[in-house]
């Protein structure tokens, strides 16, 4: 006989279900659960007097030799995912991968248990009833200036970092390239202790093919072209030829000064081949003043970096100072000041907000320590979404913000994964992918996760005083957990590399322990493949006033005077 309980009691016990709305942080974004995979009355909950115990929701007979027995069950959790939608389910993990999204439990005593989601004596359980699960974020614009960036990134929910560099050298301060086999090998060896998945760009600035190919064979997952090394048409063509031959991606920071051509010349050199454009608005660099037009092409995968996200009253002043430092400019040199002024344009930064909301800009990233903040990718994404809701209203008429939420979460999860050929491994919580999972309390969503799992093992978490009698007493701050320690760390994170480097067995050559996974399908994608962010309208820029028009309509917005997910959550 069924027991009827008030909805409020159900939500208090098992969390929200279909139709319930959940506010994300202190934003005005409300997520509504679209589907619930759990069987009412058979929910799994661990604790005193709860259901996950021997002979109830936990099988008495299933051993780990049974391939359907889970290593970890995350129960009753709300999922926000660009591919799965906004749903309620249990997440089943085995051997570091997601094996099920459905109903976990004991099929001997429960109905509708997903066949490969058995809870047994071998299964760890965490109650997710009042938590939100998202896929680990992916930041594709990392300047590897210092290794400490990895901790700040994972504390904001980033679990994959793609970029280049070799430490605090001038080349790394300005460009995201790890040049050549020696530096690539050393960086792989240096990053064994970092708790995140990592991929390195080789230096793509060379007009001959062999110096580029050898970097891909050495382990680069892609090539980065940067104007500071000379982003000429010959360089662009050579890098793309190698990329097409070796199935890697090319990322580009185009020619701000228009030294070797204008945007049209760069697009001619690209010649319809797929390319990932960095800070496509232009404040981070690129053809002045109209690099933003690149976002209208079907072969361009356009990204933003977070210092311009969202457009606020402080954005312009901050950028001028950052630019002078990052690109070794001198305020006493008029040409350097003119260079800086040409890149920082309020009109195009305002348009960038709207292009994100329209799904024209597809990817969000940091530009870590080189004008961007590595620990704010997730936060800045949701601040932009909230600002756009306030200024542009709802997207659609479904009575919630689900579509906008899915559009924005795709920008730092599945879309960068698709762009770099790693979407078969990460980028969503789909079955078969690495169990890189971020858990949030709704009130802290987008700012401070509860904990972060890497390959199904807890790597970082908010943790109280280790000498306290319980885990929660102050001071509570992020600490590395067992998943980030010793050999567990090398088992819990991976390197993304080229197939050519896997064939060359760089893992043995370099003596590294982390698994190497080859990128695939980098040359077969286009803007059409980017989830919820694949619009290709005509974009024009007034060369004197910098006004941006989309399909003939002038787009602009006011700078924000305050943003959510900010001082309410931080002391500084």
From Swiss-Prot:
InterPro entries: Amidohydro-rel, Metal-dep_hydrolase_composite, Metal_Hydrolase, Urease_alpha_N_dom, Urease_alpha_subunit, Urease_AS, Urease_asu, Urease_asu_c. Substrate binds at residue 226. Ni(2+) 2 binds at residues 224, 253, 279. It holds the Pfam family Amidohydro_1. Carboxylation allows a single lysine to coordinate two nickel ions. Binds 2 nickel ions per subunit. Residues 136-572 form the Urease domain. Ni(2+) 1 binds at residues 141, 143, 224, 367. Pathway: Nitrogen metabolism; urea degradation; CO(2) and NH(3) from urea (urease route): step 1/1. The active site is at residue 327. GO terms for biological process: urea catabolic process. The keyword Cytoplasm applies. The keyword Cytoplasm applies. Its main location: cytoplasm. The modification N6-carboxylysine is found at residue 224. Heterotrimer of UreA (gamma), UreB (beta) and UreC (alpha) subunits. Three heterotrimers associate to form the active enzyme. Belongs to the metallo-dependent hydrolases superfamily. Urease alpha subunit family. This is Urease subunit alpha. The gene is ureC.
């Amino acid at each position: 006989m069924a027991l009827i309980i008030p909805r409020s009691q159900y939500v208090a016990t098992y969390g929200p279900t279909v139709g319930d709305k959940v506010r994300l942080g202190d934003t005005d974004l409300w997520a509504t659960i679209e589907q619930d995979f759990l069987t009412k009355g058979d929910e799994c909950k661990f604790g005193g007097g709860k259901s996950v115990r021997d002979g109830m929701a936990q099988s008495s007979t299933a051993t780990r030799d049974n391939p359907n027995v889970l290593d970890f069950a995350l129960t009753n959790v709300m999922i926000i995912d660009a591919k799965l939608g906004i749903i309620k389910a249990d997440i089943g993990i085995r051997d570091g991968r997601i094996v099920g999204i459905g109903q976990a439990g004991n099929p001997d005593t429960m109905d509708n248990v997903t066949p490969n989601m058995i809870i047994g004596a071998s299964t760890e359980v965490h109650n997710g009833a009042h938590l939100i699960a998202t896929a680990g974020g992916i930041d594709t614009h990392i300047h590897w200036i210092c290794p400490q960036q990895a901790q700040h990134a994972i504390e904001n929910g980033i679990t994959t970092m793609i970029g280049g560099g070799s430490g605090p050298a001038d080349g790394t301060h300005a460009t995201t390239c790890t040049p050549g086999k020696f530096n690539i090998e050393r960086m792989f060896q240096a990053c064994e202790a970092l708790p995140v998945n990592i991929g390195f760009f080789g230096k793509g600035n060379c007009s001959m093919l062999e110096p580029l190919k050898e970097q891909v064979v050495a382990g680069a997952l892609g090539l980065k072209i940067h104007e500071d090394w000379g982003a000429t048409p010959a360089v662009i063509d050579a890098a793309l030829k190698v990329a097409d031959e070796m199935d890697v991606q090319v990322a580009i920071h185009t020619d701000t000064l228009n030294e070797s051509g204008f945007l049209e010349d760069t697009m001619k050199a690209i010649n319809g081949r797929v390319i990932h454009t960095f800070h496509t608005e232009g404040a981070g660099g690129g053809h002045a003043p109209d690099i933003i037009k690149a976002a209208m092409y079907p072969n361009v995968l356009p990204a933003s970096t977070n210092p311009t996200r969202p457009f606020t009253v402080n954005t312009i002043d901050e950028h001028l100072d950052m630019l002078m430092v990052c690109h070794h400019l001198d305020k006493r040199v008029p040409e350097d000041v003119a260079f800086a002024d040409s890149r920082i344009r309020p009109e195009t930064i305002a348009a960038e907000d709207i292009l994100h909301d329209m799904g024209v800009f597809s990817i969000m990233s940091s530009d870590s320590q080189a004008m961007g903040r590595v620990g704010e990718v997730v936060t800045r994404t949701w601040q932009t979404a909230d600002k756009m809701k306030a200024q542009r209203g709802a997207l659609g008429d479904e009575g919630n913000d689900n579509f906008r939420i899915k559009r924005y979460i795709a920008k730092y999860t599945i879309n960068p994964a698709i762009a770099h050929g790693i979407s078969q491994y990460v980028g969503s919580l789909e079955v078969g992918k690495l169990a890189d999972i971020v858990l949030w309390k709704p009130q802290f969503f987008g700012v401070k996760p509860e904990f972060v799992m890497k390959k199904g093992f807890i790597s970082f978490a908010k943790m109280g005083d280790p000498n306290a009698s319980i885990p929660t007493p102050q001071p509570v701050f992020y600490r590395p957990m067992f998943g980030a320690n010793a050999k567990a760390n090398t088992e819990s994170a991976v390197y993304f590399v080229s197939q050519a480097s896997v064939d060359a067995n760089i893992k043995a050559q370099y003596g590294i322990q982390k698994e190497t996974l080859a990128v695939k399908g980098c040359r077969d994608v286009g803007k059409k493949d980017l989830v919820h962010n694949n619009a290709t309208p005509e974009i024009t820029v007034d060369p004197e006033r910098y006004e941006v028009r989309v399909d003939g309509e002038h787009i602009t917005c006011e700078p924000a005077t305050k943003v959510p997910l900010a001082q309410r959550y931080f002391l500084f």
